[in-house]
């Protein structure tokens, strides 16, 4: 599923040489209803993106780095996995549960991009 989603993201031109991405589960409101989704969080030069495409759901939501406060890392005690918390300037937040060890690299890259936008 992970590889398929990356291939689909590539066809939508969401990935480039400087893209960082991570796969996991998160809750998102679709048509006013909260849904547990499994998809990609993508960080490229232009935007931070939630992406999911399957037979049931298509989600492509882009966020400007200027609207993001920070991407935090924590450990989920319940699931014993890492979680990333994307916090926006308007106090909205999203949490992604990730199973792989790439959370550190992904969070560092995203926070570098947020800081770069702040300094510009």
Question: Model-found features: residue ranges?
Answer:
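Canonical phosphoinositide-binding patch of PH/PH-like domains
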Residues: 88-109
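Generic signal for short, ordered secondary-structure residues
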Residues: 20, 26-27, 47-48, 85, ...
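Generic hydrophobic/packing signal
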Residues: 72-75, 88-90, 110, 114
């Amino acid at each position: 599923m992970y590889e398929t989603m990356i291939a689909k993201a590539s066809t939508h031109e969401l990935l480039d040489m400087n893209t960082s991405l991570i796969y996991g589960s998160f809750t998102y409101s679709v048509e006013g209803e909260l849904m547990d989704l499994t998809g990609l969080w993508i960080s490229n030069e232009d935007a931070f993106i939630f992406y999911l495409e399957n037979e049931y759901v298509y989600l492509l939501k882009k966020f400007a780095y200027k609207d993001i406060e920070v991407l935090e890392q924590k450990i989920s005690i319940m699931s014993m996995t890492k979680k990333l918390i994307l916090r926006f300037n308007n106090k909205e937040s999203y949490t992604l549960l990730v199973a792989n060890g790439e959370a550190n690299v992904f969070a560092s890259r995203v926070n570098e991009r947020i800081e770069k936008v702040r300094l510009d």
